[in-house]
Amino acid sequence: MKPIVQVSLDLTDIKEAMEMAHTAMRAGVDWLEAGTPFILAEGLHGVRALRKEFPNIPVVADLKTMDGGYLEAQMMAKAGATHVVVMARAHPETIKVVVQAGKDCGVTVMGDNLGCEDMVAGARMLEDLGCDMVIHHIGYDERRGIAAAGKVPPNPLDQLKAVVDAVGVPVQAVGGLSLEQAIASPSYGAPLVVIGAPLAIDADSFSRGAGNVEEVLRKICEKVHAYGDVAITPRKN
């Protein structure tokens, strides 16, 4: 699979989100993500706006579905999302119906292992239940709370290779990665590179970050795309 650069639009203002999306497209980004704060602020209107503005670009709707899975996935698909996200900590039946909605509506289902006691087992379970891709995710509050207690928070790269080896679907690492670490994800076998805070988004205010975002994104895209194909190896058991 060719490596993909995805920009997470974790913004609460639709004008800022659209400006960031246009910046990302000029820089060579492949996918746009309607981040959770953006969806909470703008709802289906925000997803529809992204689809209208960028008719040929994949749009990930990061709703973090925990229940009502079929309806939520269906609604996002009808609004124009090409990818939806369901949480591993949801009931297995929720994951199953999101997967079914993905098949019925023609969207890709990404399963997120945020909060799993065993992150590798959570990733395997998501694949077993039919998810097309796995998000290996260390949460913002988890990282911040552990750091505030004077401890070193976990990093997605700590277990990324183990997650990649455990599943036979594409993997994305999310949560607290530096730009250099995010760019290195394909070297672990994870072709889906997501960029959000701290480059594009101020993680505390959920507003656009400062600096020459377009130029930095362009360099990131060049480095990630230079990896070439990343092998996705089917599971052996």
Residue ranges of model-derived segments:
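Conserved N-terminal beta1-alpha1 strand-loop-helix module at the mouth
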Residues: M1-Y70, L126, R208-K219
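Catalytic beta/alpha-barrel core
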Residues: D10, W31-I39, P58-M66, T82-E93, ...
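General structural feature for long, well-ordered alpha-helical segments within catalytic domains
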Residues: E16, M20, G28, E42-G46, ...
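Catalytic cores of alpha/beta
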Residues: M20, G68-A79, E117-L129, A166-V169, ...
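Glycine-enriched alpha-helix->loop->beta-strand junction motifs that scaffold or abut catalytic
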Residues: R26-D30, E53-I57, K78-H83, K103-T108, ...
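Alpha-helix-loop-beta-strand connector modules within alpha/beta enzyme cores
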Residues: L40-K64, V97-G115, K151-A173, G211-P234
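Glycine-rich phosphate-binding active-site loops on the catalytic face of alpha/beta enzymes
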Residues: A81-E93, V134-I146, Y188-L217
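Active-site rim beta-loop-alpha module in soluble metabolic enzymes
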Residues: G115-A166
